[in-house]
Regions:
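S-adenosyl-L-methionine
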Residues: 1-33
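Conserved class I S-adenosyl-L-methionine
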Residues: 32-41
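Conserved SAM-binding loop of SAM-dependent methyltransferases across substrates and taxa
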Residues: 42-54
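Conserved SAM-binding motif I beta-strand of class I
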Residues: 55-60
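Conserved SAM-binding loop
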Residues: 69-70
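Conserved SAM-binding strand-loop segment of SAM-dependent methyltransferases
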Residues: 77-89
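A short SAM/SAH-binding and catalytic strip from SAM-dependent methyltransferases
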Residues: 95-111
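C-terminal substrate-binding/active-site "lid" region of AdoMet-derived donor-dependent transferases
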Residues: 107-163
């Protein structure tokens, strides 16, 4: 499945289940957080965050994927903690996020930089799987692996990484 954001084709490649908790640990996601997943796919990241007590916002342009995310949240008993937004990630309002999760392409990350910098509050954490945000300094880098895959998480903090 594919979504188009601002005319850019972004394939849906789900984050491996065994990597999710490591991402949430890296950003210290918990109660009181509002986690936005930009291009949320089947909702697995916001669902895991909701199970930790965080509220989630699932931003997805593809209606089939958004429906699947809603169904998954209902079956996991956390739908009441997640807002589902069918929108382009470049247009969605993300200003109340305390954490943003992205598994996009580097080119898309770079196009999102102005939005992230202008809309997010100082201290907001950004987790990106496998693709850096060019020109920003990561606060932490975490290598993750499973028998089937190796990945890298980059953690950025608004007001620290984007200077």
């Amino acid at each position: 499945m594919t979504s188009y954001y601002e005319g850019i084709k972004v394939p849906w490649v789900p984050t491996r289940e065994e990597f999710i908790e490591q991402a949430l640990d890296l950003a210290q996601v918990g109660k009181g957080d509002i986690l936005y997943d930009l291009g949320c796919g089947d909702g697995r990241i916001v669902i895991a965050a909701a199970k930790r007590g965080a509220r989630g916002v699932c931003v997805e342009l593809n209606p089939e994927l958004l429906k699947k995310a809603m169904e998954n949240a209902i079956s996991e008993g956390v739908a009441h903690m997640i807002k589902f937004v069918r929108d382009d990630i470049f247009r969605a309002n993300i200003s109340d996020a305390t954490v943003v999760y992205m598994y996009l392409l580097r080119s898309v990350n770079d196009l999102l930089k102005p939005k992230l910098k202008s809309e997010l509050k100082k201290g907001t954490r950004i987790i990106s799987l496998d693709f850096e945000i060019s020109g920003w300094k990561e606060v932490k880098v975490l290598r993750v692996s499973s028998p089937a895959r190796i990945g890298t998480y980059y953690l950025y903090v608004i007001g620290v990484s984007d200077i």
